[in-house]
């Protein structure tokens, strides 16, 4: 087996440090493992993305070590049951209107009556 590159060693070290820092915090170890597993398939050539994720992980490590973090979780959008276009309380998306009140230019949406 070939030796790990410097970046690979840094990522592995970050993984171990995050697991250590997350001990005793509900959801932390599972979240760390899931996050690393999600990005494990990144190609080695995608160095910019790997470095970005590494920096993001270092910031998360600092937060975990700071003592202010008592647990670790993530905001997730609930999946809609099969056959329904959106989740609970979501309006159906007809594809014609933007998802927010501003269109792609950032200008407010105008109503048909001109207001």
UniProtKB/Swiss-Prot annotation:
Keyword set, alphabetical order: Chaperone, Disease variant, Mitochondrion, Primary mitochondrial disease, Repeat
InterPro entries associated with the record: Complex1_LYR_dom, Complex1_LYR_SDHAF1_LYRM8, SDHAF1
Motif (LYR motif 1): 14-16
Repeat keyword on record: yes
Phenotype when changing residue 55 to P: In MC2DN2; reduces but does not prevent interaction with HSC20 or SDHB
Residue numbers covered by motif LYR motif 2: 53-55
GO cellular component: mitochondrial matrix; mitochondrion; nucleoplasm
Segments of this protein annotated with the region Interaction with SDHB: 53-65
Region (Disordered): 74-115
Example GO biological process: mitochondrial respiratory chain complex II assembly
Tissue: Ubiquitously expressed.
Subcellular location per the Swiss-Prot or TrEMBL entry: Mitochondrion matrix
Any single Pfam family the record assigns to this protein: Complex1_LYR
Task of the protein: Plays an essential role in the assembly of succinate dehydrogenase (SDH), an enzyme complex (also referred to as respiratory complex II) that is a component of both the tricarboxylic acid (TCA) cycle and the mitochondrial electron transport chain, and which couples the oxidation of succinate to fumarate with the reduction of ubiquinone (coenzyme Q) to ubiquinol. Promotes maturation of the iron-sulfur protein subunit SDHB of the SDH catalytic dimer, protecting it from the deleterious effects of oxidants. May act together with SDHAF3.
Note: Riboflavin supplementation, which is used as a treatment in SDHAF1-deficient patients, enhances SDHA flavinylation and activity and reduces levels of HIF1A, HIF2A and succinate.
Similarity-based family: Belongs to the complex I LYR family. SDHAF1 subfamily.
Disease: Mitochondrial complex II deficiency, nuclear type 2: A form of mitochondrial complex II deficiency, a disorder with heterogeneous clinical manifestations. Some patients have multisystem involvement of the brain, heart, muscle, liver, and kidneys resulting in death in infancy, whereas others have only isolated cardiac or muscle involvement with onset in adulthood and normal cognition.
Quaternary structure and partners: Interacts with SDHB within an SDHA-SDHB subcomplex. Also interacts with the iron-sulfur transfer complex formed by HSC20, HSPA9 and ISCU through direct binding to HSC20. Binding of SDHAF1 to SDHB precedes and is necessary for recruitment of the iron-sulfur transfer complex by SDHAF1.
PANTHER family: SUCCINATE DEHYDROGENASE ASSEMBLY FACTOR 1, MITOCHONDRIAL
Protein's name in the database: Succinate dehydrogenase assembly factor 1, mitochondrial
Source organism (scientific name): Homo sapiens (Human)
């Amino acid at each position: 087996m070939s030796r790990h590159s410097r970046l690979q060693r840094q990522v592995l070290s970050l993984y171990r440090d995050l697991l250590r820092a997350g001990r005793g915090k509900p959801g932390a170890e599972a979240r760390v493992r899931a996050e690393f597993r999600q990005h494990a398939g990144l190609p080695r050539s995608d160095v910019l993305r790997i470095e970005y994720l590494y920096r993001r992980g270092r910031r998360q490590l600092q937060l975990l070590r700071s003592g202010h973090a008592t647990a670790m979780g993530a905001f997730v959008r609930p999946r809609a049951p099969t056959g329904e276009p959106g989740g609970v309380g979501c309006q159906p998306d007809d594809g014609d209107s933007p998802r927010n009140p501003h269109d792609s230019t950032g200008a407010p949406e105008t109503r048909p009556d001109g207001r």
